[in-house]
């Protein structure tokens, strides 16, 4: 009997110690903003999976080589949110400005075409700092196969840290705008989500839309998007769903659709559509100036 009571006492004591240790090692609860930010990476992961397949690569012809004569910006370092250093192609405003345009590359990387786009936005917008974030940390692809390999090895958490670092680099009083194409179009929308109340306007060119309603509801700025009816990434059906989800979330999305395929706005793309590029660019500039 004594042996039984002793055994029972040991079991109860052990259970109590385990329970105390469990409570001691639990992490504090995340607030709603942190939950939205760190969970629900489905959109980025879905893009990474899709962009790692040959079918996606076939939609992207190797970019035409461009040789810019006099670029306006230079590569500068900044602190990413993961404690590591990031880099960006940066053009400071001619006069001190709290307006920042974050430019995000296509899946090729921060190549000369993106730098030229950053220069053009700087010229046409005027009073703005332009920061084209290097999402691949110095790597650039010249062929669909090499871009596909870069995407397969991409760390989406690192990319979130780069965007967060760029926003912090701009400063707490900065008004954050964003623009990107394809891979960058997806990240332009994610930038608006990550920037929270600092976000003032986001331009997305044929980027994968966000479908998570909590993330869509967290958006605090207007969105303008340009899509191709002949595109399959995102497909017209995905764009229609995006419009419906944004409406359901109570957010303002203006979507323009062109009879064009994927990458229609890239002059270095052999399937470039000049008319769609000109119209969408004029609308993008007007949108950014109005916000």
Regions found by a protein language model. Name each.
Residues 219, 225-227:
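Short beta-strand/loop motif that positions the catalytic acidic residue
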Residues 198-208:
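A conserved short beta-strand
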Residues 117, 235-245:
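Short alpha-helix in the alpha/beta-hydrolase fold that links the catalytic acid
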Residues 180-184, 188:
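Gly/Ala-rich beta-loop-alpha elbow adjacent to hydrolase catalytic centers
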Residues 249-291:
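C-terminal catalytic histidine-bearing segment of alpha/beta-hydrolase fold enzymes
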Residues 230-234:
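Acidic catalytic loop of the alpha/beta-hydrolase fold
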Residues 171-181:
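Alpha/beta-hydrolase fold nucleophile elbow
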Residues 25-56, 61-69, 75-170:
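Serine-hydrolase catalytic machinery in alpha/beta-hydrolase-like enzymes
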